[in-house]
Each structure stands twice: as structure tokens, then as C-alpha cells.
Amino acid sequence: SIGYSFIKLNTYEDVLANFRAQLAEFNAKKLEEKGHAASFSDAEFNRIMIHMDNHSVYESAKILRDKYILQLDNGENVYLDFFSNDTDRNIYQVTHQVTMDKVHKEDVVYKNRYDVTVLINGLPMIQIELKRPGVEINEAINQINRYRKFSFKGLFRYLQLFVVSNSVQTKYFCNENEMVDGRYNPILKSLVFFWTDDKNTRINDLNTFTSEFFCKPAITEMIDKYMIIKTTEPVLMVMRPYQIYAVKAAKKRVLEVKQNGYVFACTGSGKTLTSFKLAQLLREEARVDL
């Protein structure tokens, strides 16, 4: 109902093949302008994977938001995109029960099978882990922490967000980079958030959450505008709902109402991050002179 295409992907090999096809379709116009078919040869895709593979979560998040200059077999260079803020251009897919094992990705430690994976342009971007009603939601968080440590390798390093639910409670949180020595710190429960409406009412029901959080404009905006890739340290962050609503309201006040205003919040609520993100988004507006 929210416009995603379902695709059956059983193994990491299937994930790679799908990424190859979707990335070519996503960049079809650019490829055709270079006199190239909307597909990649084995040699071209190998060059892409050399660029994409074996990076940290933090490095992968930066690659996702950047362009890659691919030398085509015909000698032309093309600037490939991996993600766009244009929902009409992105390709949204969903799959379930992907199995990661050493047979298909040698740096996997233990075999795991994932519940639901959301892919954008062929890249796994959001992982959803579901539990039965009555099962503690922290079990799903612990499960994701195990996956991060033992099997989220290769293109699964491009996961940006996680969603956990037992149908009556639903939360989201950001992926986290591994330590310098390769160890993985568990994602803190304090960094796992409920989604709310603009009146701060929690949205716990999984179906309602899905229709709001995963609608194409909302999830695209979340990844594009409301995640922070810090430059001073290898850290990824995602904003809380009230921070997002505050940024939207303040930005609207600046661009449309043209009046003064302020955002108030209590100590420890993330005012600095909210202010930073507002300034960052306003800087991207050509009509704002900062």
C-alpha cells in the first residue's frame, strides 16, 4: 500500500545481483547519455564493488551520499549516484528472510537470517526485526546487535536505520560504527526512539508506524535530511521526532512566514543538534543568505 516492490532474495549472492540491476536502472539516464546500455558488464560491476566493499559503517554512510566516477568499458566516465532525495527517482523494494553465511560472504562469522529488509536502489538501507506480541522489544535490539557483530557484512554495512517491533511497541534507531579495533559496542537503549506525531503522541502500532514512517517521502527525508554523519569523529546519528518537527517548523518560519521565532526545550533534549541541523538545511536554500 505504500508503493514498495516485493522481491525474493534468499542469499547474499541474490542481494548483489539485485543491487547490480537496480543501480543500473537508477543511473540509466546517465549511462545512456554515455552511449552505454542501462546495465553493467562484469568488469564494470567488479570496479563498483571494489569501491563499495570492505568499508566501515561510517565510511559506507559517506559513500552512500557521494558520487562515484566509474570508468565504463567504452572508455567514458560516468558519475554514479547511490541515493537521491527524489522519491520519483529512487527504487524502493522490500524483502524478507535473507540469509547471510560464510558460503556467500567469507567474513560472516555466524549464519543469520533476517526478518525484513528495505532496499533503496538495491542497497539494504533499513533492517526490521519483529517479535511476537508479549515478547520484550529489547530482544529484537539485542538480536540486531548480534547481527552487527557477526553477519552485517558487505552491502549490509550500508544499513542506515533499524526498526524493531512486537506489534504493540515499535521503535527506530540508527546504525553505529564499529570501534577502531574492530569491536562493536552494543547500541544503547537510550538511543532507541519511539516515533510520534507532531503533538508528541507515540505511534506504537506497527501498521500505523509503517504507513507514516515508511511512506516514500518520509523515509527518504529521514535518510537525506535528518541523519547526521559527523565529520569530527566516525559517528552516525538520527534525530528524535520532536527534533525533526522543530526543525521543520523553524525552517517554515524562516522561509515562508518571515517572522522571528524560537524553539524551546528542556536540558538534554538535543537543542544543539536541532540548531545545527536547522542551520545546515537553511544553508542549502539558495534564497537564504547566511
Model-found features: residue ranges?
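ATP-dependent helicase/translocase motor core
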Residues: 1-289
